[in-house]
Swiss-Prot record:
Domain of life: Bacteria
Pfam families (alphabetical): Mur_ligase, Mur_ligase_C, Mur_ligase_M
EC number(s) recorded for this UniProt protein: 6.3.2.8
Protein's gene: murC
Listed name of the protein: UDP-N-acetylmuramate--L-alanine ligase
NCBIfam families xref list: murC
Assigned keywords, A-Z: ATP-binding, Cell cycle, Cell division, Cell shape, Cell wall biogenesis/degradation, Cytoplasm, Ligase, Nucleotide-binding, Peptidoglycan synthesis
Ligase among keywords: yes
Pathway involvement of the protein, from the record: Cell wall biogenesis; peptidoglycan biosynthesis
Residue positions binding ATP: 122-128
């Protein structure tokens, strides 16, 4: 049946039921929450229960554990994440019933039709930059909609339907899906070699994808680009769109000067166009987070947010889940008191930035790292860089690679990585199996006063939270 549509409410009434396959993912759950708030009847399936699925259920979504063809019956549209296999029973049933199927990024693009889109891309820093941008626009009274790949701690959610005209969202380059978006403003934080398996193991194709991403801006759109990153600077020089640059470079349109780290905060002078300046205290550690804040400040300034409002947003920022989260101090059975930091970093560049932030704020402490490598392909592709950066810490415990659906690759596991680190002669890494084993092994490595970084994109975050709440008890201990 062909239904006549006149406005957004007509769309909801005509096609009210939307089903998400893999609804527990960070990107999927955020879109689902926005659509719930818009008035859609949202259902979804996932193999595991998590914070996101529980939140969606509390908001009225119907959540199913596991995947079944019956889950999609009666729905008007099926949204799928890139992690869903082609033989998924729900996807196959949707095809057989000729139910429209939308990739996650395509549905995000549909939401952008009803707002003015700001897309945040880059190999590293997307989640924090998106969150900071949403915070700046909110402080400026613009009430944005946001869809973030992590939990914005102040909101207790990774998405919100705002009343304003702007939508701020992460643009995922990992599988090229960011090329489905048509924003009015695009941020690129940096361009690095990651997810090469989706680009034919050819970095030139990654570079070309980011160039095409900017080409999707309208002629009146704006590219907000970090020229401290050489790849982004090269792209800025040749992109045929309006550019606002940011960074610590003297040539940047929006820049930070007099940058000083004070524990878990950064203090700097924010230089804006037209000779405007503002003293800023950023409630996040590390020079990489200063760059993330500059991107948010650039967008805020462009949209008329006052400099003092930008500063208030940055100082009051409560953080994002698993991005240098200070979980507090825990005492081992032997009496050693250690501070635990939980972080999502899983690429050598991210590890290096987090290590620098930790040493900048706690230079007097021993830096102990528990790291769970993520994906065999990334471990293989970045093997030498991982070995180099992990060799720089005072003590290291590695859990086995979190496969994320990949099959093992010879020479790309944690034991091989430990051998490479050991050969450098600077540390003696300890290797465990599952991340859950870290709770019982770490006390033998830790000393009083240590700073413990627990890092990785797999399930190590749950282990960090368990230790912070329950102490250093092995899995299954009372």
């Amino acid at each position: 049946m062909i239904r006549r549509l006149h406005d957004t409410n007509d769309l909801v009434r005509a096609f009210p039921r939307v089903h998400f396959v893999g609804i527990g993912g960070t990107g999927m759950s955020g879109i689902a929450e926005v659509m719930l708030t818009l008035g859609y009847e949202v259902s979804g399936s996932d193999n595991a229960d998590n914070v996101a699925t529980r939140r969606l259920a509390s908001l009225g979504a119907r959540i199913m554990r596991g995947h079944s063809a019956a889950n999609v019956l009666g729905t008007d549209c099926v949204v799928v994440s890139s992690a869903i296999r082609e033989d998924n029973p729900e996807l196959m049933e949707a095809r057989s019933q000729r139910i429209p199927i939308m990739p996650r990024a395509a549905m995000l693009a549909e939401l952008m039709r009803f707002r003015r889109g700001i897309a945040v891309a880059g190999t590293h820093g997307k989640t924090t930059t998106t969150s900071l941008t949403a915070a700046v626009l909110s402080e400026g009274g613009l009430d944005p909609t946001f869809v973030i790949g992590g939990q914005l701690l102040a909101a207790g959610a990774n998405a919100k339907l705002g009343g304003g005209q702007w939508l701020v969202a992460e643009a995922d380059e990992s599988d090229g899906s960011f090329l489905r978006l048509n924003p009015l403003m695009s941020i690129i934080t940096n361009i690095d070699a990651d997810h090469l398996e989706n680009y034919g193991n050819d970095f030139a194709r990654v570079q070309a994808a980011f160039a095409e991403f900017l080409q999707r801006l309208p002629f009146y759109g704006l590219a907000v680009l970090c020229i401290d990153d050489p790849e982004v600077a090269a792209l800025a020089a040749r992109t045929p769109r309006h550019v606002m640059s940011y960074g610590m470079s003297p040539q940047a349109d929006v820049r930070a000067e007099n940058v000083v780290q004070e524990g878990s905060r950064m203090r700097f002078t924010l230089r804006l166009p037209q000779g405007t300046s503002q003293e800023v205290v950023l409630a996040l550690p590390g020079r990489h987070n200063v760059l993330n804040a500059l991107a948010a400040a650039a967008v805020g300034w462009q949209l008329g947010v006052a400099p003092d409002a930008i500063a208030r947003a940055l100082e009051g920022f409560a953080g994002v889940g698993r991005r240098f989260n200070d979980l507090g101090e825990v005492t081992t059975a032997s009496g050693a008191k250690v501070r635990i930091i939980d972080d999502y970093g899983h690429h050598p560049s991210e590890l290096e930035a987090v290590f620098a932030a930790a040493r900048g704020g706690w230079a007097d402490k021993r830096l102990v790292v528990a790291f769970q490598p993520h994906r065999y392909s990334r471990t293989r592709d970045q093997f030498d860089k991982f070995a180099a950066v992990l060799s720089s810490v005072d003590a290291l415990v590695l859990s086995e690679v979190y496969p994320a659906g990949e099959e093992p690759i010879a020479g790309a596991d944690s034991h091989a990585l430990a051998r490479a680190i050991r050969a450098r002669g600077r540390s003696e890494p300890v290797v465990v199996g599952k991340a859950a084993e870290l709770a019982s092994v770490l006390p033998d490595v830790l000393q009083d006063g240590d700073l413990l970084l627990m890092m990785g994109a797999g399930d190590i975050g749950a282990v960090a939270t368990h230790i912070a709440v329950e102490g250093f008890k092995g899995e299954g201990e009372a």
